[in-house]
Structures are given as structure tokens and as C-alpha cells.
Amino acid sequence: MLVDSFNRVIDYIRVSVTKQCNFRCQYCMPATPLDFFDGEELLPLDNVLEFLKIAIDEGVKKIRITGGEPLLRKGLDEFIAKLHAYNKEVALVLSTNGFLLKKMAKDLKNAGLSRVNVSLDSLKSDRVLKISQKDALKNALEGIEESLKVGLKLKLNTVVMKSVNDDEILELLEYAKNRRIQIRYIEFMENTHAKSLVKGLKEEEILDLIAQKYKIMGMEKPKQGSSKIYTLENGYQFGIIAPHSDDFCQSCNRIRLASDGKICPCLYYQDAIDAKEAIMNKDTKNIKRLLKQSVINKPEKNMWNDKNSETPTRAFYYTGG
């Protein structure tokens, strides 16, 4: 079992399989050239697999595959199948922008993936183009429908931005509700790679907009996880991830492995442990040691709710958000 200095059990790893992305979203990497990462040094997926087997043996019960855009990584379905075969009790989920999802959904489902989280920031084509610098809405929606068709569980993630997509909060909720998908609204998390003009809506502002149409009956906070779950009068549930107001760090159960082999204890802080050599050598003893050290290094909490704190400098496309 992996336990940090604050007695939190760490049983969830987010694994970035690439920094590359086919989008250039305003809140993540808007100014990065599309070919910027052509020469990136990636950990071979077989080596990542061995690392994750060790992590599973140490008590990890959930693995999320991220990027960049993870569906750009070749051989991903085979990697997931091998991971699933090693321990079928481990939940395997994936975060994607959905652009390549339609053609890959069936293979991902057959490989053993249990759920997909799709970023959907707008239902308007021109707005998606403005946000992501990609004419991507049609592909994303088709990917969502195909995932439902093949039986993949789904969640939608929406980063809510002032004067960008805040007028679509209800429309996006209706879209998700009609498909029995949970949508999670995410407060914009300031970082030095985002456009400086991007401003997010806070949790209470999002709730006020939803309350204009729906009666919110209650809220529950899962013991683990970063989102609060709200229930509407009709029984539909949606989530809000609010790092500026919610101290979800007290129940944090995760660490992150970047595509270059660094283990990141926290999304906010720059600190990381370089495990590349151990992973490349499949050095079980050292991997265990570095894994445990990264857990011990986890800070008590992030600082997004501190107005005097510095803006995080490590890119979300590096750690996988």
C-alpha cells in the first residue's frame, strides 16, 4: 500500500503517454507550434506497462491514460489490453479531446478500457474552433456517440470560461442529461501556458446559472476524487471541480507519471522525481523506491485557492491535467 506523509492512501495513477496534442486550447497550450514535440523522447509502452504492474502490486486500483492527446500514441489499444490482462480489477480510464475517438472506441472497449472522459467545451462549431484552434466538434460528437454505441462508459469535462462558453452551461447539461452522461464543469486553473486573457467562472457562478432552470436538491462529496456531485430535482447528477474553493486535496489519492519518466506528486507544484532510468532498465527495486518516494513527497495541498500564490509553470499537457 502507498501512503503519503498525511496518511492519504495513493491508489490512482494518471499516466501521460505523450505531450503531443492535435488541439491548441486557450487554457492549455495555445501558442505551441503543432510540430513542437515531433522529437519528444517517449517511454516505450512496454516499459510503462512494467512500471504500472509494479504500481498495481503496490496497491494502485485505478489508472487514467492521458496526454497531450493519448489517442495519438500508436499501439495504445494493445497497451491497454496487456494492462487489463494483468489485473482485471484495476479500473482503466482515458481522457481525450474525442477527435480520434470514433474510429478507436470499439478497439478501446475490447481492450478492457472501462470509461472515457471527453473534453467538450462547446456545442458550437465556430466556438470550438476558437477555443481549440481545430475544427473539431463534428469528430468529437461522433466519438461520443460511437463510445455509447459500443458500451463505453462516458463522462464529459467542460472548462468554463467567462465570455467564451459560459452561456452554454445549460445547453451542455441538457446534451449530457439526454444521453445519461455525467458532465463535470471545471474551474479554469491558472497556468503560465494558458492565454493571459482567459478567465474562469467560479463554482457558485456555475451553480447560479444552472439554478435558473433547475432546482438543485443536494450535493455529495465522494471520499476520493476532485469533484463535488450535485443532484437535480429530476435525479440527474453533474459534477463541479473547484480548486479555488474546494479543499479536495485532503482526500487526494493520485500521482502522475509524465511521458518522459518523471513522477509528479502534485499537478500544482513543479517538484518531480526522475524515474526514467529505472523504468527503462525495468529495475523493479528502484521503481518501487522511487514510487514510494514520490508518494512521500506529496504536498499537503495545492495553492489555487491562495490569491497570493505563484501561477503554476509546469504545463498541463506535460502532466496530463
Swiss-Prot record:
InterPro entries membership: Aldolase_TIM, Elp3/MiaA/NifB-like_rSAM, MoaA, MoaA_NifB_PqqE_Fe-S-bd_CS, MoaA_twitch, MoCo_biosynth_MoaA/MoaC, rSAM
Residues engaged in binding [4Fe-4S] cluster 2: C249, C252, C266
Annotated positions binding S-adenosyl-L-methionine: Y27, G68, S119, M189
Binding site for [4Fe-4S] cluster 1: C21, C25, C28
Reaction equation(s) it catalyzes: GTP + AH2 + S-adenosyl-L-methionine = (8S)-3',8-cyclo-7,8-dihydroguanosine 5'-triphosphate + 5'-deoxyadenosine + L-methionine + A + H(+)
Alphabetical keyword list: 4Fe-4S, GTP-binding, Iron, Iron-sulfur, Lyase, Metal-binding, Molybdenum cofactor biosynthesis, Nucleotide-binding, S-adenosyl-L-methionine
Record CDD domains: Radical_SAM (cd01335), Twitch_MoaA (cd21117)
Top-rank taxon, per record: Bacteria
Database matches in Gene3D superfamilies: Aldolase class I (3.20.20.70)
Domain called Radical SAM core: residue spans: 5-233
Cofactor: how and how many bound: Binds 2 [4Fe-4S] clusters. Binds 1 [4Fe-4S] cluster coordinated with 3 cysteines and an exchangeable S-adenosyl-L-methionine and 1 [4Fe-4S] cluster coordinated with 3 cysteines and the GTP-derived substrate.
EC number: 4.1.99.22
Signal peptide from the UniProt entry: none
Positions contributing to GTP binding: R14, R64, S95, K155, R254, I255, R256
Protein name: GTP 3',8-cyclase
The species this protein was found in: Helicobacter pylori (strain P12)
